[in-house]
């Protein structure tokens, strides 16, 4: 597909707009056909391979087991090395940590009689089945597996509904378990009812408990999922169970599993039903879901998958939906594996957040009341892993689909309005989980508006965020949930306002890390203030963004200064650069670099550009000069986790952009691949995959809340990004595994020697032509005045 675009003269910092046009080459292969959903299903990626749509409410995917009934094989429900499947659940989250989440209402075909309760099948020895990857197929919007019990399973999805086929073998019982209580981390209530006359099963499960085992206050339920399942074959029998009791001919069941330690439900608890069919039956089932009501689940199903729909038809619709979404970026060149890795990363980006409103516009709010989307929205969204996705995910989503970005922003504002004015940092369905640190909703909204998402109540959201950043609440002063799930939106805000840093003893998950996160949040808030015309607020929050300097100890080590914990009295506790004391999922050596909006200021505190370069070189390399990109110890980068993802781009500020090109390509080539272990750690609802997409395009949104793009080098010879403001054409005809260094760049036909692009590229589009070579041109982009901008504290 090609579209006209407006070209912008970037060479003069886009001061003059030039009219123009270009036509993108059609992609040689269907983007959806190149997706490999099994990427990330091992190595801690925690992705799932099942059927879903872009941002879909339903994700129908297998639940694997490693022989423990109350534990999923991996968060996300699927582990490539786990040899058994115990069900196919209707909901999943991709790339999470902890013990998992969602995994609601598993359906499981079994070819034996149901003689004991599935809830006491402690080792998944009776009602699970082995499978082999040779009998498995996954594609965008479709999943199929032939189980060792002889049943062939096919799954496909619409936005709020899905369809499955269970082809049972001849000569064996044909039973289908509906394990309604068995969400991945348990449930507090479950109900299910069989109507044999209409061949329908309906029910609901009440769950939540994401990372609840880390804080007792969060071991709770906060959503209910309703489902309606309509079958095309008559039921020959039915039954139910509750805990250890089995009821032959039962048509109802009630009872959740409850919650237990370590994030998993207790053994021996739960409820569900089963239905039987004639031996050898080919059974089709259409399922609608809703987080509001059974009536809405039924309406969602009827609207999306009418009774005459076939599974091949739904599979094709899902394929087309993914093609349309993925085709927002067209690439040409590279290897087949590189193209598959790229489009699978973009696929993972578009899995979350998720549509949470029904076809009638209703959704369950954080106050557990039913609400309706407002006039600006097309949908309400849920599942916001803020600490992760504010870094580069929401920028990409919004640039490609500005209405989705706008709806996410409005959804977050609605959540805050329904949550006593608090913007939670990690939301799951209709609940606040408080997981991680900082105040990521602020940069999230600033990211969205910077990349083209404008259809939300910016004035109202800004006022709400300012209040949260300036008025200390009881939750901000509470230790509930700490360390990992501190309940305050701005933990220890009183210290921030009084000390101008978060102290070593606080109501936060690490004073130093919280200080850096709050500094980024306040910088983003200054950007929102600029957008709404609040000059005083812009100056106030830009000044506060500079508070990170109060935790820089120039005498931390004989080798140089570090950002570290600081006591409330101003003294410095004992310190070593490998410590994680005061930080979140990273060491002081990693967090030293996390000042993305004021990199020049950081370099100055380190003693100047040359000293910063020396420390960056040591950060990315072992003593022998080899790369240290992950698992090299706490003194080095961890490019498998968020605190390090911006660091390879810092060489652009240091006058050595060729080192950014080199480091980013090393990560792309060695840590990412077209294989189950092809994501280096938790994908975190698509955040890490978004980093890969940006890096493969040769650019990155370093500064929270702004649309400047730092430059690396393109992986592909040709790419077209159909962005919110216009098409961006990226040509690098010499791109190859060897030719990774930028020797020259033209923008809209004019020579360009800066290793970054101003916001006008995102806002209006443009044409980039890279000259790449196997050897670096160490002069290109190296001049001091060519470096990307920094934003120091405001001074009158």
Predicted regions located by residue number:
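Bacterial N-terminal signal peptides that target proteins for export
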Residues: 1-10
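Bacterial N-terminal signal peptides
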Residues: 9-18
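Sec/Tat signal peptide C-region and signal peptidase I cleavage site
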Residues: 20-24
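Accessory carbohydrate-recognition regions in carbohydrate-active enzymes
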Residues: 25-443, 449-516, 529-550, 556, ...
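ATP-dependent phospho-/nucleotidyl transfer catalytic cores
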Residues: 521
């Amino acid at each position: 597909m090609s579209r006209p675009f407006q070209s912008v003269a970037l060479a003069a910092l886009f001061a003059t707009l030039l009219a123009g046009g270009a036509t993108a080459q059609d992609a040689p292969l269907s983007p959806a056909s190149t997706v490999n959903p099994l990427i990330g299903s091992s190595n801690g990626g925690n992705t799932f391979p099942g059927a879903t749509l872009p941002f879909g409410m339903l994700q129908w995917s297998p639940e694997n087991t490693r022989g423990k009934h109350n534990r999923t094989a991996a968060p996300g429900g699927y582990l490539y090395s786990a040899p058994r499947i115990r069900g196919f659940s209707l909901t999943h989250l991709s790339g999470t940590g902890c013990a998992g989440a969602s995994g609601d209402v598993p359906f499981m075909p079994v070819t034996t009689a149901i003689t004991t309760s599935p809830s006491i099948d402690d080792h998944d020895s009776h009602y699970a089945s082995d499978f082999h990857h040779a009998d498995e197929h996954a594609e965008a919007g479709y999943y199929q597996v032939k189980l060792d019990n002889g049943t062939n399973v096919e799954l496909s999805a619409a936005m709020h509904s899905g369809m499955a086929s269970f082809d049972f073998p001849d000569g064996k019982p044909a039973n289908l378990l509906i394990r309604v209580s068995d969400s991945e981390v348990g449930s507090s209530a479950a109900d299910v009812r069989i109507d044999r006359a209409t061949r329908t099963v309906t029910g609901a499960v009440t769950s939540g408990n994401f990372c609840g085992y880390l804080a007792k206050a969060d071991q709770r339920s906060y959503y209910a999922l309703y489902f309606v399942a309509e079958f095309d074959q008559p039921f020959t029998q039915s039954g139910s169970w509750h805990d250890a009791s089995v009821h032959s001919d039962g048509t109802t069941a009630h009872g959740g599993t409850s919650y237990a330690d370590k994030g998993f439900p207790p053994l021996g608890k739960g409820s569900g039903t089963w239905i039987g069919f004639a031996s050898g039956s080919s059974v089709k089932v259409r399922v609608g879901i809703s987080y509001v009501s059974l009536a809405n689940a039924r309406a969602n199903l009827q609207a999306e998958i009418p009774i005459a729909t076939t599974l091949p038809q739904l599979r094709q619709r899902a394929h087309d939906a993914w093609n349309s979404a993925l085709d927002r970026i067209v690439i040409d060149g590279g290897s087949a594996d590189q193209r598959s890795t790229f489009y699978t990363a973009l696929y993972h980006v578009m899995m979350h957040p998720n549509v949470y409103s029904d076809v009638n516009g209703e959704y369950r709010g954080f106050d557990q009341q039913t609400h309706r989307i407002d006039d600006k929205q097309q949908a309400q969204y849920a599942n916001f892993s803020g600490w992760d996705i504010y870094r580069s995910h929401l920028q990409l989503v919004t640039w490609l689909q500005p209405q989705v970005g706008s709806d996410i922003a409005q959804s977050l504002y609605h959540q805050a309005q329904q949550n006593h004015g608090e913007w939670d940092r990690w939301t799951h369905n209709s609940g606040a989980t408080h997981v991680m640190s900082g105040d990521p909703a602020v940069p999230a909204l600033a990211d969205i508006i910077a990349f083209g998402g404008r259809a939300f109540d910016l004035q109202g959201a800004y006022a709400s965020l300012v209040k949260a950043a300036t008025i200390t609440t009881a939750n901000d002063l509470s230790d509930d949930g700490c360390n990992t799930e501190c309940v305050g939106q701005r933990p220890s805000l009183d210290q921030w306002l009084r000390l101008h840093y978060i102290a070593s003893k606080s109501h936060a998950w690490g004073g130093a890390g919280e200080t850096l996160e709050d500094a980024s949040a306040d910088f983003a808030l200054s950007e929102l203030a600029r957008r709404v015309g609040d000059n005083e607020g812009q100056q106030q929050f830009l000044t506060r963004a500079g508070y990170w300097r109060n935790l820089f100890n120039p005498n931390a080590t004989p080798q140089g200064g570090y950002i570290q914990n600081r006591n409330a009295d101003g003294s410095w506790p004992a310190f070593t650069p490998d410590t994680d004391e005061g930080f979140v999922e990273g060491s002081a050596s990693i967090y030293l670099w996390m000042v993305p909006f004021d990199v020049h200021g950081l370099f100055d505190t380190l003693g100047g550009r040359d000293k910063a370069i020396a420390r960056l070189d040591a950060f990315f390399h072992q003593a022998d000069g080899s790369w240290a990109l992950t698992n090299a110890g706490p003194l080095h980068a961890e490019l498998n986790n968020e605190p390090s993802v911006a660091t390879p781009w810092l060489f652009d500020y240091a006058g050595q952009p060729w080192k950014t090109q080199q480091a980013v390509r090393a990560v792309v080539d060695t840590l990412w691949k077209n294989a189950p272990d092809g994501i280096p750690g938790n994908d975190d609802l698509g955040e890490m995959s978004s980093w890969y997409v940006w890096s493969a395009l040769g650019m990155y949104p370093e500064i929270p809340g702004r649309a400047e793009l730092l430059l690396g080098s393109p992986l592909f010879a040709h790419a077209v990004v159909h962005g919110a403001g216009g098409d961006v054409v990226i040509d690098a005809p010499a791109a190859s595994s060897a030719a990774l260094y930028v020797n020259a760049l033209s923008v809209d036909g004019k020579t360009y020697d800066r290793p970054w692009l101003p916001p006008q590229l995102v806002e209006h589009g443009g044409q980039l032509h890279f000259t790449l070579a196997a050897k670096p041109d160490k002069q290109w982009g190296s001049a001091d005045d060519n470096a990307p901008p920094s934003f120091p504290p405001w001074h009158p």
